[in-house]
Amino acid sequence: MSDYQVLLYYKYTTIDDPETFAKEHLAACKEMELKGRILVATEGINGTVSGTVEATNKYMDYMANDARFADMVFKIDAADSHAFKKMHVRPRAEIVSLSLEEDVNPLEITGDYLEPAEFRDALLDEDTVILDARNDYEFDIGHFRGAVRPDIQNFRELPGWIEDNRDQLEDKKIVTYCTGGIRCEKFSGWLKTAGFEDVSQLHGGIATYGKNEETKGELWDGQMYVFDERIAVPINQVNPTIVGKDYFDGTPCERYINCANPYCNKQILASLENEKKYLRSCSHECRVHPANLYTKELSKEEFTERLQAIDETLPETVQ
């Protein structure tokens, strides 16, 4: 039995003073020795925290005693240690950043909820468009079979992508999904305000689908990206596969790294071997960038040799 747990949760509810709430909530979390990242806004709370089983259970009880969060659903993952290095509770304008000119309140308008078994049926329906509401790098390490991959790097780019591709979605039955459900609550509501009529969402997100006893994560390929130290977690309990491809050679890969150029910081899938071979950098420009954190640790001679090994050279200004 694991000694730690990771809790994923959200709740759209009114928080009158997010700044004061954040300060008091941070103190409570630290007292329980939790670590994680929580966003609070007037529209609600969105968080992921880790801690011992005892501490996380205490936290769930603590939240249940607040009428605003009494019915909040927690997605619980067993863990061997903390999934975060620190504890942050931050006030924000939104608990998910869609940055609309006219905000959408999921308590007033949102897509129909599909439970895991219903969502699986939708996956098998050729007349249904399954739309991934996550970022491209999340999709690349794992997604539902046949899902549409929007070419976006931030959630706030999704409405623009929809408008650019409206002709492919018009008059279609749309079912959307995300990690835990929070993004789809607002996004599916926006879809309805944007004129799409038949809009549904996976209730509880991928995390709930993967733990459902009926679906057991079936028809999910790869792993689910998470925004903590774990990076990705398994979902499919029936016939797991690897869909991620190494950025450098296209071989199967589920290991994410960040480009060593801090001005880039692009997330790429790469084996340990290729990380070393390509100096943990996504391009030649990033490899020779003066701020590169990986190459700073190399002597000029070693740097030159490593570049030559991949048929590259130092710029004349560096030589």
From Swiss-Prot:
Catalyzed reactions: uridine(34) in tRNA + AH2 + O2 = 5-hydroxyuridine(34) in tRNA + A + H2O
Keyword terms of this UniProt record: Oxidoreductase, tRNA processing
InterPro entries (alphabetical): Rhodanese-like_dom (IPR001763), Rhodanese-like_dom_sf (IPR036873), Rhodanese_C (IPR022111), TrhO (IPR020936), TRHO_N (IPR040503)
The protein's enzyme class: oxidoreductase
One function term, GO molecular function aspect: oxidoreductase activity, acting on paired donors, with incorporation or reduction of molecular oxygen
Record carries keyword Iron-sulfur: no
Pfam family, one: Rhodanese
EC number: 1.14.-.-
Primary role: Catalyzes oxygen-dependent 5-hydroxyuridine (ho5U) modification at position 34 in tRNAs.
HAMAP family for the chain: TrhO (MF_00469)
Protein family membership: Belongs to the TrhO family.
This protein's name: tRNA uridine(34) hydroxylase
Organism this protein belongs to: Listeria innocua serovar 6a (strain ATCC BAA-680 / CLIP 11262)
